[in-house]
Amino acid sequence: LQRPFESDGFGLLADEAAALELSARLLRFTFRRHDNGYRRRRIDEAADILNSEFARPLTIAEIARRVGLNECYLKRYFKAQTGETVAGRLRRLRLEHALALIESGSTVQAAMHFCGYRHAGRFNEAFRRHYGFLPSDAKKC
């Protein structure tokens, strides 16, 4: 990449700069492709944790640590990949399982505790917002 007719040395510097820029672009492209696969696997892993451990008192910080992402990236990429927020997915899973338990004969209190809720007021409010009726009304249906 040397320019033999330029004696000031700047031609060589310009060529080296162009080569470095090309190398940087290739590396960014390579890592971006790898990074997307890495992130996709991390988000799938986070979804698996939510699906299997929804009844535990999970935090976004704990999930992020376990999958190797920081909290902001986890929240951003989870929403982009799944269409749901991490907290929204956790709430939906808990409430769906609670409804199934109540409909199969469990008490509201047992379903609430099994699905990770510790306070009846919060459970009732989340349930009502999600389904449009209270958990006690689900038993009557």
Predicted region positions:
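Basic/polar phosphate-binding segments, predominantly the helix-turn-helix DNA-binding elements
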Residues: 25-29, 45, 49-93, 112-137
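Short, basic/aromatic-rich helical patch in the C-terminal catalytic core of site-specific tyrosine
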Residues: 98
